[in-house]
Amino acid sequence: ESHTFKEIAQMGLEMLGTVREEQVWKAVRLAEQSLAQLGADWVLEVSHMGYLFGLFDALGVPEVARPGLLEKLREKNAHELRRAARAAGVDDAGADALTGLLELSGSYEETLAKAEAACRNDRMRAAAAELRALAKTLEAAGGAVRLDLSLAGEMEYYNGLVFQGYLQGLPRPL
């Protein structure tokens, strides 16, 4: 138990209807600018749920097992992720691919190159292409943006780009 409050002050942005890439990029830029306004050292981590879902599809992960695997990814618990993957019928090579997501984290360009090389299907390639397009926008903006493909949102809710920000001195994402 964390002994922290159950309520969390947070801010979000939701886009309804057809969402174009430019709108997504603007949302990421807004997050960057918001963190920069706080004046402390900051990091913005970016991921794409399409990459995770594409890997699940490629490995034949049953729908019922996916929320549990996402939970283990969020916890960054390689041992339990492997165990849950094997319990879901994923072979050793597939479990290696899932735990490998935990290593797809770091500088945006280097991590994206590794992610592109690991794509197994069109869904993963499409997510990587969207992250590549976003990289061009981020280069122009500067800032401390990292790619972390183990960053996973709630399965029922998030389906595309996800991101969260950190400030120096705070133990949790904003």
Give the location of each predicted region.
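Short, conserved phosphate-binding/catalytic loop or strand-edge motifs used
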Residues: 7-11, 46-54
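Short glycine/threonine-rich loop-to-helix capping motif typified by GTGT followed
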Residues: 55-63, 156-163
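Hydrophobic mid-domain F-helix/FG-region of cytochrome P450s
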Residues: 32-36, 50-60
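Positively charged, Gly/Ser-enriched RNA/tRNA-binding surfaces
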Residues: 1-41, 84-174
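Short, solvent-exposed helix-helix connector turns and helix-capping sites enriched
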Residues: 48, 76-77, 107
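Acidic, His- and aromatic-enriched active-site or binding-groove loops in soluble protein domains
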Residues: 61-86, 90, 167-170
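A generic structural motif
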Residues: 42-47, 68-72, 148-149
